[in-house]
Amino acid sequence: ADPDDAYENRIHIPNADRHLAAWPKDAATFRKSFAGADLNLAYGSSKRTYYDLFTPQGGIEAACGLAAFVHGGYWLALSKDDFSHMAAGLLARGWAVAILSYTLAPQARITQITREISTAVEHLGKTGTGPLRLIGHSAGGHLVSRMMCDDINFGPVTTQRLDRVLSVSGLHDLRPLQRLAKNELWQLDENESQAESPLLRTPRPGIDLVCLAGADERPEFIRQNAILPLVWQGLGANCHSQLLAGHNHFTIIETMTRADSRLCELVDCPLS
């Protein structure tokens, strides 16, 4: 089998380019029309270590919690500015939502990107009140899963608040990615691909994990979605995987815009 094709989404998704073209436009429209937007807040000192904060009526203190979204794009593409509208569903449920950017490869190795996201999460732990929950899509699913691993340390406030992670179409074992043409840009070697794979790490207690993927995704993404909970359950973590019928790699994350979506429920509601 062709390893590049196994991890290729665009050519296998109907109207894929239409989705990708719509996201920045819909995001810009949302930013202009939404009153409770605080844009381009710094969490680090690099050019892309910024986030946008969207708060429901009553402001951050009235929110029932803070959800942070980490975008995908294979650690190579996209930014927070493509995903602002994804805050809509959780805002309607009373959550504040932070949408993050981070330094992309090849300017940063994946190890550095992980460090940036941990800095962002620690910063957000001091923002608002109530639970802190992380949502990541694709490469972002990898990054939020890494925040559960026991080599990532947060201060007491963030540790107390961070209670759930949702990895949507996430990549949890990076070793196969060494075989991809894109690895010219990532520069993953055996050491880094092992160290950066949540699958090969130990989960910290006290954080629930849901891995969610579309039933119409590429088989390799469905496999990556299933493997992390299978391994981490054996290490005592409260985690499970789900497939969402009728959804592919792009449509699944678009359900974040709808308050009644399964994705928003999994962020907001008690897990059975």
Regions found by a protein language model. Name each.
Residues 57-90:
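Short, surface-exposed "cap/lid" segments of acyl-processing enzymes
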Residues 69-72, 99, 135, 211:
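Structural cue for short, hydrophobic secondary-structure segments
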Residues 158-159, 164-178, 190-227:
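The feature captures the conserved acid-bearing segment of alpha/beta-hydrolase catalytic domains
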Residues 70, 168, 244-247:
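Alpha/beta-hydrolase
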Residues 2, 6-59:
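N-terminal cap/lid segment of alpha/beta-hydrolase-fold proteins
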Residues 222, 226-229, 233-272:
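C-terminal catalytic histidine-bearing segment of alpha/beta-hydrolase fold enzymes
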Residues 78-87, 98-133, 258:
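Catalytic nucleophile-loop/oxyanion-hole region of alpha/beta-hydrolase
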